[in-house]
Amino acid sequence: MPNQGEDCYFFFFYSTCTKGDSCPFRHCEAALGNETVCTLWQEGRCFRQVCRFRHMEIDKKRSEIPCYWENQPTGCQKLNCAFHHNRGRYVDGLFLPPSKTVLPTVPESPEEEVKASQLSVQQNKLSVQSNPSPQLRSVMKVESSENVPSPTHPPVVINAADDDEDDDDQFSEEGDETKTPTLQPTPEVHNGLRVTSVRKPAVNIKQGECLNFGIKTLEEIKSKKMKEKSKKQGEGSSGVSSLLLHPEPVPGPEKENVRTVVRTVTLSTKQGEEPLVRLSLTERLGKRKFSAGGDSDPPLKRSLAQRLGKKVEAPEANIDKTPKRAQVSKSLKERLGMSADPNNEDATEKVNKVGEIHVKTLEEILLERASQKRGELQTKLKTEGPSKTDDSTSGARSSSTIRIKTFSEVLAEKKHRQQEAERQKSKKDTTCIKLKTDSEIKKTVVLPPIVASKGQSEEPAGKTKSMQEVHIKTLEEIKLEKALRVQQSSESSTSSPSQHEATPGARRLLRIAKRTGMKEEKNLQEGNEVDSQSSIRTEAKEASGETTGVDITNIQVKRCETMREKHMQKQQEREKSVLTPLRGDVASCNTQVAEKPVLTAVPGITRHLTKRLPTKSSQKVEVEISGIGDSVLNVKYAAQTLEKRGKAKPKVNVKPSVVKVVSSPKLAPKRKAVEMHPAVIAAVKPLSSSSVLQEPPAKKAAVAVVPLVSEDKSVTVPEAENPRDSLVLPPTQSSSDSSPPEVSGPSSSQMSMKTRRLSSASTGKPQLSVEDDFEKLIWEISGGKLEAEIDLDPGKDEDDLLLELSEMIDS
């Protein structure tokens, strides 16, 4: 195979094949430098081990082509260079004599003398030519050496050398008519590479004169070139493209020199035109300029076939072109072929001044469409509202020329408009804030996730106000609405207790989900009314949720100060009501309270409050037991309000699933209550008049525990003992609606209210499930050892008891 196959291109022409023996093509050193094709190989029967002839189609007589590298500063360094060398050279210490063949003179080419004239210019300008590239002859085998124009163009290799220039020259002379339009852009491609590569920019754009093959003097050729150049500048080729000379075989080194000259030389015109001393940036980068005259045919972006040199029939309108000097003073963006967006119209005006038809690129068309769409958008925005028109027109007025807005600018404008609309709406909201309709308040009570999501409950009202305005609320507005809601609920609560007492027998279902509980706690802490407002909130929600007879929409929102005054009055009333009853009644109240948290562990109502470690300053304990999936017992404990009230008397404040038991941290009442303990259990029974008869076994078991606990501690426990009691006592009041008969004084009405609320919390749920859940809860809290776990040491400090309680919850 290595002997019969084709020659390795890189081995024979560049001696650079690095594959060695693994190369599938033939490496035969005997054939190096030989240009004779093996006829046996052509017939497919060359079996010689060492064949001195080439197993490759030789399409050019390289021995008649001057070596390009001979005239370079480094000289030709190839040991087996097949090209013609006029002088001897040293390669790796070996002297190689000049070539023996004589270069034939070709009389047909009228340009060879011109090339000779360029030799002097080439000497100084061609220092740009860089390293001798190994790809210089990449196209050499494509064309035959005769002057017959080949039907196929040699493939364009970007850094290729001048070996294919002969073919280009043949095209330029004989196939000029068809080839010119195609190759007009080609020089630009190569011009862009001209700084770094030796590739010749393609072909002269001569139209008719090159058909005359008479031998002319140098002066005639130069004058003709200048005339052609003045005619054809601006035809879409660079300013030099008409001056580019097309080498034909020239005797001696002249052809070699001329070849290199063509790449960088620019000649100024004779007829008093401005000399183009330097190529413009467009020409050097190979970008296209607009075509002149009425020729709209060559597009700004050439097709792939044109760029690769395929022949395309061109319109004859190319011949008559008006000179275009306006391109000399183009802006940088225009010379780079990039039209700046704001100057689109200016650029088209310039083109029209010269009398040209401007062929738009795809980018320009897309930009125009985008600008039209944006213009439509702006007109729509103008029609929408006056605030929008101000913003959209201000941008248009600012610049006299039409300015295409970017996407980010449009977004910024929209945001600005929305903010203005928000400001206006917030002003309206602050001036006239009214309560929502009954149904919307029910939404906030029955569907608390709506309350939880920021300001969403406010939006239905906004939509009913005006469907045209889509309003996105700011954080400040949401906070304002929350504060207003807190005020509204607290105000409505002031009227609701009186309604509760007026209708003592009515049952109410209070539907509260998890998140409202958390929100209530947060809002209460923010309002600095931790104890009083939570019960007020519950009453308010009951009233708004279920009492349909009351028209809440007419209640106006009042200021926070008046609310606080009412709360203080209410607290004083409660103090009086708490101070009046006897100690025995107090004990019975506390026992009842201890039972009530058990009732709140209804499976349907779960509220998770964050556990806080007890601190003496706040003296709050939250017991959170989530052992049973649904029922969570939260005992909340606050002695703060007691210190406000001055007297250490207990106040009972019960919310469904959040119970606040307030008791005195003083030890003297504790001891007294221990003495009165027998009254405790006596007072419990009348309260649960309906359910005492049907005591479940769970109750008996739990009541057995109660005396044990109460022997060594009182029922009005300081700080932490009361929560434990509340965990133990059973749910006796889950269905009792009647007010307790034995509780005396104002506390009896209070107790009836609490009992009613508790019964409402558990109505609709079967009592057995409540008791079962409670049994499970007690069993889980105590870990199966009720008496052992719940026994408390009366001598322990309050903090020790609190720590024990938190440890028990954690375990």
Curated annotation (Swiss-Prot):
Q: Where is the composition biased (Low complexity)?
A: 487-499, 730-749
Entry GO terms, CC:
nuclear speck
One Pfam family in the UniProt entry: zf-CCCH_3
Coiled coil ranges: 363-424
| Gene Ontology biological process terms from the UniProt entry | poly(A)+ mRNA export from nucleus
Annotated protein name in UniProt: Zinc finger CCCH domain-containing protein 11A
Q: Residue spans with biased composition (Polar residues)?
A: 392-403, 750-766
Which keywords belong to this entry?
A: Coiled coil, Isopeptide bond, Metal-binding, mRNA transport, Nucleus, Phosphoprotein, Repeat, Transport, Ubl conjugation, Zinc, Zinc-finger
Residue ranges, annotated region (Disordered): 140-195, 224-258, 286-352, 368-434, 483-550, 716-769
Record PTM Phosphothreonine, positions in chain: 322
- PTM sites of type Phosphoserine: 109, 133, 150, 172, 291, 371
User: Which is one GO molecular function term here?
Assistant: zinc ion binding
Q: Which gene encodes it?
A: ZC3H11A
Task: Give the location in the cell.
Answer: Nucleus speckle
Compositionally skewed regions (Acidic residues) per UniProt? 161-176
Q: Where is the composition biased (Basic and acidic residues)?
A: 310-323, 368-391, 418-434
User: Where are the zinc-finger regions (C3H1-type) in this chain?
Assistant: 2-30, 32-58, 61-87
Quaternary structure, per UniProt, is:
Interacts with TREX complex components THOC2, DDX39 and POLDIP3; the interactions are ATP-dependent. Interacts with PABPN1; this interaction retains ZC3H11A in nuclear speckles. Interacts with KPNA3.
InterPro entries membership: Znf-CCCH_3, Znf_CCCH
Tagged with keyword Phosphoprotein: yes
**Task performed by this protein:** Through its association with TREX complex components, may participate in the export and post-transcriptional coordination of selected mRNA transcripts, including those required to maintain the metabolic processes in embryonic cells. Binds RNA.
Primary location class: nucleus
